[in-house]
């Protein structure tokens, strides 16, 4: 019987725990769902105990149902949903439900941070103080729940709380710490200036560790609870985007990730902390020690296609609808789609912009609209590539995951619009794979995450850009880039109309 590592993927709706062997093969996998607490619009919370019990149930199932010998589980690590605020008292007991990344109640606190710190905040953290980040949530509790705040002695993020319950040690890894927007990225330490300006005790900030650092071993109490042994080593882990980048092999400067889920992410490996995108793109510590990544988010990437299919092709198969785009031409016969149907994050931080089809002609067929949606999502990603190129970014390979990697046609569209080689993964497992790789590297199975990727990460067919298509898409993207400014005022007026009618 071989030795294993566990990758714990702590998501927003479920936890998935994967057991992998030395060759990177998944030998067993279990998951457990948990609930979201939505007390009113804009509020999204979870009970941290649900994460602990869900993770434990998944581990118990691996041991009992999948017959995994606990003595052969050498180590484990985590991928965690980012930004969620977990407040603990002096005895490290949870004080209130966790406020999650998708909670938007803290707009007044964001405005306060901007007023007090201005551009200096972005200079220190490399990020804007968005409602999704942890700091605004801390301030919201401070200002709206003074009794809770008076008892609060520590804050951690979701995976950190699960790790604490397993090991008895409080810590936060750098990749998650940058997402709190309390970290001085250049110095690699909690920002005294930000804490002082906002009257947040530095003592609340947990110790910082690297993703591959040993955070402890399983306690006797948790061993009895879960079936793991007290010899099981527990490593720091990473934020879900960092772990996802590791699992996709984004471990070299020449590589960029193109991820199409409900939202879309373009993520680039960064070598040093000197790169500054002035808050237009998020800038975070990577799971690789002393390395970083930048990322931009398209809010409605896969959701654009889901909306289109639900509205115009509800009874048809996803694959067939995507394939129909091949009947159209490069550039969708002169039809453009902007995927701003729920607002946009990057490069335009604009909650009121809305999507559009531009250039609709009486000769257009449904397949032209399908292709326009596929292309429009990638044009939005191309906007982010332009930012990289303007800042001297040099990369030649794009790793595509999610919905965009499931269609050869869509992979070729990406290669042509990006004008770069695009590859998919043959063993796409998302952040859970990255978490397992962190544990494997921490244990010394491999010298580095890059070495681990040589064994654990496998790429599929490479799609090379077609020079003729590249030229056509360059013309279409130049037109696409004009649509935002041309429709911004119209979108605001239409949104005002809709709100007045509600």
From Swiss-Prot:
It catalyses: D-xylulose + ATP = D-xylulose 5-phosphate + ADP + H(+). It holds the Pfam family FGGY_C. Its EC number is 2.7.1.17. Keywords: ATP-binding, Carbohydrate metabolism, Kinase, Nucleotide-binding, Transferase, Xylose metabolism. Belongs to the FGGY kinase family. The record marks 9 as: Important for activity. The lineage of its organism: Bacteria, Bacillati, Bacillota, Bacilli, Lactobacillales. Catalyzes the phosphorylation of D-xylulose to D-xylulose 5-phosphate. This is Xylulose kinase. Induction: By D-xylose. GO terms for biological process: D-xylose metabolic process; xylulose catabolic process. The active site is at 240 (proton acceptor). One of its GO terms (molecular function) is ATP binding. It comes from Levilactobacillus brevis. Substrate binds at residues 82-83.
């Amino acid at each position: 019987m071989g030795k294993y590592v566990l990758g714990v993927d702590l998501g927003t709706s479920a936890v998935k725990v994967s057991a992998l062997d030395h060759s990177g093969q998944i030998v067993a996998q279990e998951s457990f769902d948990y609930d979201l607490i939505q007390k009113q619009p804009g509020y999204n919370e979870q009970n941290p105990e649900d994460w602990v019990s869900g993770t434990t149930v998944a581990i118990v199932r691996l041991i009992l149902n999948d017959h995994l010998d606990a003595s052969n589980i050498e180590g484990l690590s985590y991928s965690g949903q980012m930004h969620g605020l977990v407040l603990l008292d002096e005895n490290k007991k949870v004080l209130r439900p966790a406020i999650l990344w998708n909670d938007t109640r803290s707009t007044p606190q964001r405005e306060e941070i901007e007023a007090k710190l201005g551009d200096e905040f972005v200079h220190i953290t490399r990020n804007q103080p968005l409602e999704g980040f942890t700091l605004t949530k801390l301030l919201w509790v401070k200002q709206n729940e003074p009794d809770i705040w008076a008892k609060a002695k520590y804050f951690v993020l979701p995976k950190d709380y699960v790790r604490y319950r397993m090991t008895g040690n409080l810590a936060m890894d750098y990749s998650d710490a940058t997402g709190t927007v309390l970290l001085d990225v250049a110095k690699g330490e909690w920002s005294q200036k930000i804490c002082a300006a906002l009257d947040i005790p530095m003592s609340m900030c947990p110790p910082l560790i690297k993703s591959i650092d040993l955070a402890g071993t399983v306690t006797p109490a948790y061993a009895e609870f879960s079936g793991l042994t007290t010899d099981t080593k527990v490593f720091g882990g990473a934020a879900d985007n960092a772990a996802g980048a590791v699992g996709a092999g984004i471990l070299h400067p020449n590589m960029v990730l193109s991820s199409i889920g409900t939202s879309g992410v373009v993520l680039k490996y960064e070598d040093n902390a000197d790169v500054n995108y002035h808050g237009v793109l998020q800038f975070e510590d990577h799971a690789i020690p002393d390395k970083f990544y930048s990322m931009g988010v398209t809010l409605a990437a896969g959701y654009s296609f889901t909306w289109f299919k639900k509205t115009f092709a509800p009874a048809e198969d996803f694959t067939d609808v995507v394939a129909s785009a091949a009947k159209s031409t490069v550039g969708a016969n002169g039809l453009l789609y902007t995927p701003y149907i729920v607002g946009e994050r990057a490069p335009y931080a604009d909650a009121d912009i809305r999507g559009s089809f531009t250039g609709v002609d009486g000769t257009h067929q449904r397949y032209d609209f399908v292709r326009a949606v596929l292309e429009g999502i990638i044009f939005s990603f191309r906007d982010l590539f332009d930012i990289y190129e303007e800042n001297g970014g040099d990369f030649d390979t794009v790793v595509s995951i999610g919905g965009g990697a499931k269609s050869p046609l869509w992979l070729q569209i990406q290669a042509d619009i990006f004008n770069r080689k695009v590859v998919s993964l043959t063993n796409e497992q998302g952040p859970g794979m990255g978490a397992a790789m962190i544990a494997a590297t921490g244990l010394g199975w491999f010298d580095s995450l890059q070495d681990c990727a040589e064994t654990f990460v496998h790429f599929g067919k490479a799609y090379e850009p077609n020079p003729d298509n590249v030229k056509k898409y360059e013309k279409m993207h130049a037109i696409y880039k004009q649509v935002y400014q041309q429709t911004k005022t119209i979108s605001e007026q239409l949104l005002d109309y809709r709100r007045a009618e509600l």
